[in-house]
From Swiss-Prot:
One of its GO terms (molecular function) is 4-alpha-hydroxytetrahydrobiopterin dehydratase activity. Transmembrane segments: none annotated. One of its GO terms (biological process) is tetrahydrobiopterin biosynthetic process. This is Putative pterin-4-alpha-carbinolamine dehydratase. It is an enzyme of class 4 (lyase). It holds the Pfam family Pterin_4a. InterPro entries: PCD_sf (IPR036428), Pterin_deHydtase (IPR001533). Belongs to the pterin-4-alpha-carbinolamine dehydratase family. The lineage of its organism: Bacteria, Bacillati, Cyanobacteriota, Cyanophyceae, Synechococcales. Its EC number is 4.2.1.96. It comes from Prochlorococcus marinus (strain MIT 9301). It catalyses: (4aS,6R)-4a-hydroxy-L-erythro-5,6,7,8-tetrahydrobiopterin = (6R)-L-erythro-6,7-dihydrobiopterin + H2O. Keywords: Lyase. It comes from the Bacteria.
Length: 96
């Protein structure tokens, strides 16, 4: 997949199509909450496997049962179709 920067209209569609994600400072971000650390870490492990598949890696934080994921494409300096795809895949994992 060749990444390209999403335009304003595409970004507006992204936050509607992919629930829970917000646009903040040239990145998309979502907070995920779990019952405990084990569930949070299991989620992160599943996400890591998808990230490797796309060779695209998030900035993320984990504090006990909370995971915050931030996506952007550093090489292009903004939010791309690759970030959109990864956000959608991450939501699928969370919804399982």
């Amino acid at each position: 997949m060749e990444p390209y920067i999403l335009q304003d209209e595409e970004l507006n569609e992204l936050v509607v199509k992919i629930p829970g994600w917000e646009i903040k400072s040239k990145q998309i971000q979502r907070e995920f909450n779990f019952a405990n650390f084990i569930e949070a870490f299991a989620f992160m492990t599943k996400v890591a496997l998808i990230c490797e598949k796309y060779n695209h890696h998030p900035n993320w934080e984990n504090v006990y049962a909370k995971v915050i994921i931030k996506l952007n494409t550093h090489d292009l300096g903004g939010i791309t179709n690759l970030d959109q795809t990864l956000a959608s895949e991450i939501n699928k994992i969370f919804d399982q």
